[in-house]
Each structure stands twice: as structure tokens, then as C-alpha cells.
A protein has these predicted regions:
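Catalytic-core "active-site belt" of small-molecule-metabolizing enzymes
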Residues: 1-153
Length: 153
């Protein structure tokens, strides 16, 4: 499975991180297969970072090959959705950004992409452009979002 992710895609989160620049194009990054953490397995904080952050994400499973797909046909190219957590070694990311280096080591480390069980878009509410999602840790809500708030859809 190839993971293609859009970084800096929520204005509110960008503001929390102190990003003031508004990107005209999406920031794309990828994660390798070894980043996938599923089936309820535990996440272990890597020893190479002192500052691992989490971001709750909506994950869409692509089911067909395609390229330059018109937005009105996009629904034909996915078949399931779930919630996920994108773990980031934020201390490394700051260092890499300052040096103009790629993010693979801070975003693509083993088990840095936790994903839930996929369900059909209909089971998730139908409209992927208006999905609510949240993250609870030990019974306390720590993040909440809606796909309508994405900068790039």
C-alpha cells in the first residue's frame, strides 16, 4: 500500500504550529509500507526523537489506477475510508525544514501511520467532504476536525 499524504492541509492546525504562509499548492509527502500500523497494535515512541506529535487524519483507500482525474469523477477511484493518526518526529522536522531537506525520516518512520478499520463511504456518512472525526486519548478528546476544513480536497 502506498501512502500519499497532504501536509499543512488544515488552516487551524497550521496556525497552532506557527505557520503563517498560505500555500497555493498542496504539500505532498509519502510514507512507506513499513509506516503502516493497524489491527489495534500499539505505537511505541521512537528513541530517535524527543518530540513526537500526532495528527488525526481521514484516510481514503484508492481502488483504481488513475491520473489527472476530474473532481466530478473522483468518487469512482476510492472505495473505503477510515480514521488514522499521522505521527511526526517534530524536532527532526524542524531541523530538516531549516536545512531544506526532505521529511521522510521525521514522517515515514516505522509505525508512523496508524490506521483504523476501513468502512464504505456510505457507512461513514456518504459525503467525504463533510466528515467529522476526532481522537480520544484515555477517554478524553484531544483533537476534532471536519474534512470541510481542508485547504486542499
Amino acid at each position: 500500500m502506498k501512502i500519499i499524504a497532504v501536509g499543512m492541509n488544515y488552516a487551524r492546525h497550521n496556525k497552532e504550529l506557527g505557520h503563517t504562509q498560505i500555500n497555493q499548492e498542496p504539500v505532498i509527502f509519502m510514507k512507506p509500507d513499513s509506516a503502516i500500523l493497524k489491527d489495534g497494535k500499539p505505537f511505541f515512541v521512537p528513541d530517535f526523537s524527543n518530540e513526537v506529535h500526532y495528527e488525526t487524519e481521514v484516510v481514503v483507500r484508492i481502488c483504481r489506477l488513475g491520473k489527472n482525474i476530474a473532481p466530478r469523477f473522483a468518487h469512482r477511484y476510492y472505495d473505503a475510508v477510515t480514521v488514522g493518526i499521522d505521527f511526526t518526529a517534530r524536532d527532526l522536522q524542524r531541523k530538516f525544514r531549516e536545512a531544506g531537506n526532505p521529511w521522510e525520516l521525521c514522517k515515514g518512520f516505522d509505525n508512523s501511520a496508524a490506521i483504523g478499520t476501513f468502512i464504505s463511504p456510505e457507512q461513514a456518512g456518504g459525503d467525504l467532504q463533510k466528515l467529522d472525526f476526532h481522537l480520544d486519548i484515555d477517554g478524553k478528546e484531544v483533537q476534532r476536525g471536519n474534512t470541510a476544513d481542508m485547504l486542499f480536497r
